[in-house]
Curated annotation (Swiss-Prot):
Pathway entry: Metabolic intermediate biosynthesis; 1-deoxy-D-xylulose 5-phosphate biosynthesis; 1-deoxy-D-xylulose 5-phosphate from D-glyceraldehyde 3-phosphate and pyruvate: step 1/1
Residue positions binding Mg(2+): 146, 175
Catalytic activity: D-glyceraldehyde 3-phosphate + pyruvate + H(+) = 1-deoxy-D-xylulose 5-phosphate + CO2
Keywords, alphabetical: Isoprene biosynthesis, Magnesium, Metal-binding, Thiamine biosynthesis, Thiamine pyrophosphate, Transferase
Cofactor remark from the record: Binds 1 Mg(2+) ion per subunit. Binds 1 thiamine pyrophosphate per subunit.
Protein name per Swiss-Prot or TrEMBL: 1-deoxy-D-xylulose-5-phosphate synthase
PROSITE patterns (alphabetical): TRANSKETOLASE_1, TRANSKETOLASE_2
Annotated organism of origin: Clostridium perfringens (strain SM101 / Type A)
Gene that this sequence comes from: dxs
InterPro entries hit by this protein: Dxylulose-5-P_synthase, THDP-binding, Transketo_C/PFOR_II, Transketolase-like_Pyr-bd, Transketolase_BS, Transketolase_C, Transketolase_CS
GO biological process, alphabetically ordered: 1-deoxy-D-xylulose 5-phosphate biosynthetic process; isopentenyl diphosphate biosynthetic process, methylerythritol 4-phosphate pathway; terpenoid biosynthetic process; thiamine biosynthetic process
Amino acid sequence: MSEILQKITDPKEIKDLDEKELEMLAKELREFLIESVSNTGGHFASNLGVIDLTVALFKNFDFSENRIIWDVGHQSYAYKILTGRKDKFNTLRQYGGLCGFPKRTESEYDFFATGHSSTSLSSAAGMARAQKILGKDNKVIAVIGDGALTGGMALEALNDIGYRKDNLIIILNDNQMSICKNVGGLATYLNKLRMGVGYNKLKSDIGSTLDTTSLGKRVKNSLSKLKDGIKKIVVPSMYFEDIGLKYFGIVDGHNIRELNEVLSIAKSIKGPVIIHTVTKKGKGYELAEKNPNKYHGVSPFDLGEGVISKFANRNYSSTFGEEMIKLAKNDDKVVAITAAMPDGTGLKDFREEFPDRFFDVGIAEQHAVTLAAGMAAEGLKPFFAVYSTFLQRAYDQVLHDVCIQNLPVTLCLDRAGLVGEDGETHQGIFDISFLSPMPNMTIVAPKCIDEMEVILKWASNFNAPLAIRYPRGGDIDVNLKPLSKIEYGKWEKVQEGEKIAIVATGKMVQHAMIAAQKIKEEKNIDILIINATFIKPIDKELLNSLSKDGFKIVTIEDNIKKGGFGEGVLEYLNEIGHEEKIVTLAFNDKFIEHGKPDILYRINGLDAEGIKNTLIELL
């Protein structure tokens, strides 16, 4: 029963709660989240891990005046609940419902939208400097995980913050795991800090003893000059203080008393402060505590049974991983790279089988691309598996380090197209538009899962920059035969027809097949369907033939229209003087909100019914 949670109508009321009531509030929040997210799905383990911290933050700060930014933002559920959104929580990540990430248009308490990693420190520094220029004295708080802290942008911000002495508080939520196990030098450093309790205990014991006498206090002041030396002896390299941040840690992120104590001190300090808290992902739900990776993001599940595997059927990511293992067994030059997503991209088994040819660089997409370029320059065959939305972070590296040098790096763009419930920050609908203008870049897409094998095999012998884009999940129940071989720049006629030709990319071929079947049933007309295996270059020979034969042409893609595949086709058809109607079906110039993919495709006219209606208008 949520006795305290139920009564809270304003987050300011939390400041009046005593320690016991705060602990009860945290318990009730945990129970509510477990019940609610098990019904709606969402980010589960990470949110259970920060509940106590969230409660302590509200105890110490008034967020109608102060500012808080949640890095990535997937761990902001308790914050949303306590800022007036509890009654809407059953709509989480549903179309028209609550977003799974902070969103400025959703609440006055969401000060900065997040979704991608490692952005909080830069935005917090910007807010802190704005406060100073505007003559305000409010605190800005950034909550960042140990995984996000491995991102280059976060490290750049830390360096600048330490130099500028911004008046902000950084809370390092160290759960020893981002989505997958953290890697790299900073992760190793944080591990040493966690284990370096000797320094913290020594400092506390000496201070307590010396404070008992006036002489002791004078001695304590003198000894403070030795502080840096002691730290360097007992705790390895106090990185944060070396760059100019006041460091507090290690703090138990589930002990509200400890959190209150350190937050009350931190808010009185002028300048940058970092509070190092250690939390446990999945706290309060045993199955999530034991397997936080499995419970990172969940679909609705039964609390008694726990999460069943997300994809009972074959999916593109797992198939990619299987085929990569086959390639590596036959070619010792094949290497795999990922940016902190070995499980999500399907490379977990590859990592186990080929540890010397697997490189998880952490949240560092820019580094990953140029690392791949260096490998390619020396004759290796690097495959960089990355979610489409995250490749946006490495645009310059793809252009400058890969394409200009025409190096054979293969970019494997998982989650291309709609991802659904994660919303605007995660939809993979821009990659065709930002990759197509790059000289030397080739872009391909399988129309079905089985086609992944032939495309990857062909890719392993392709000697130029290449992007393979494929969607989240599996196929629609459509009977499609995979290509038996790849011919560069050539498209495939999947179904013969008359009057109208659909030219579709990737999984949209499946939508086109269903739409064409509806036309056949309703109008008894066969629609020509073409699988544009190559998004770039386009098959000019086939387009010439379609134009000569008088076909009306419909292009379909799960990318934005601006700069997309359809615009490229339209440009060429205009050049050759095509006289029949041309229709481009793609996402319009807007961000696509969160919701189930089926709903989003329907709203944007890209489901089978919407495609059918477009075809009927052309007949």
